[in-house]
Swiss-Prot record:
CDD domains: HAM1. The keyword Hydrolase applies. This is dITP/XTP pyrophosphatase. Its cofactor is Mg(2+). The active site is at D67. Keywords: Hydrolase, Magnesium, Metal-binding, Nucleotide metabolism, Nucleotide-binding. Its EC number is 3.6.1.66. Homodimer. Belongs to the HAM1 NTPase family. GO terms for molecular function: dITP diphosphatase activity; ITP diphosphatase activity; metal ion binding; nucleotide binding; ribonucleoside triphosphate phosphatase activity; XTP diphosphatase activity. Substrate binds at T8, S9, N10, P11, G12, K13, S68, F152, G153, Y154, D155, K175, H180, R181.
């Protein structure tokens, strides 16, 4: 791929995707005046397809969308597909983290297991009947308080036992090798024709 539209306006996702997709030229949809698609799907995969199709149809170019979020099994999968708006539509990362920590306040260490899930959809064109779909999972534990300034979203409370730090304390070089998004993009690369 020489050029691709990124079907997101999330600055954190744009930065990570640009790093992970280099040397492909990544054009954020906002640069073309394309607004976010309405996320009406009931799964990460459905939302990734909706977003990629929306951007591809308006740009008339291939588009890649990522729909990802945090899944906490002890909270019945919350925040899940609502991760970005867990504390409300106008919520920011800090609000969402506080909502999560509040809901988990009385949970034991065993109940704090969590994972990030990423679904990526690549549409060659708006009517692509066979979009490429790839997924990745990144396991961790929800800490009791935020720590670290790297990354975005729930990274400050996503603790990685093997690294003894949160995802927000990891250098970008390491996170971009082990994250859910990195795993999904590696899977996508394997699906691309030579």
């Amino acid at each position: 791929m020489k050029e691709i539209i990124l079907a997101t306006s999330n600055p954190g996702k744009i930065k990570e995707l640009e790093q992970l997709l280099a040397p492909t030229l990544c054009i954020p949809q906002a640069d073309l005046g394309i607004s976010d698609a309405e996320e009406t799907g009931l799964s990460f995969i459905e939302n990734a397809i909706l977003k990629a199709r929306h951007a591809s149809s308006l740009a008339n170019k291939p588009a890649l969308a990522d729909d990802s979020g945090l899944v906490v099994p002890s909270l019945n999968g919350e925040p899940g597909i609502y991760s970005a708006r867990y504390a409300g539509i106008k919520a920011n990362d800090e609000n969402n983290i506080q909502q999560l920590l509040s809901k988990m306040a009385d949970l034991s260490q065993e109940q704090r297991q969590a994972y990030f899930f990423c679904a990526i959809a690549l549409m060659q064109h708006a009517k692509d009947p066979t979009p490429l779909i790839a997924t990745g999972v990144f396991h961790g534990v929800i800490s009791v308080k935020p720590s670290g300034t790297n990354g975005f979203g729930y990274d400050p409370v996503f603790y990685l036992n093997e690294y003894q730090c949160t995802a927000a304390e990891l250098p970008a070089k390491i996170k971009n090798r082990i994250s859910h998004r990195a795993k999904a993009l590696n899977q996508l690369r394997a699906l691309l024709p030579d």
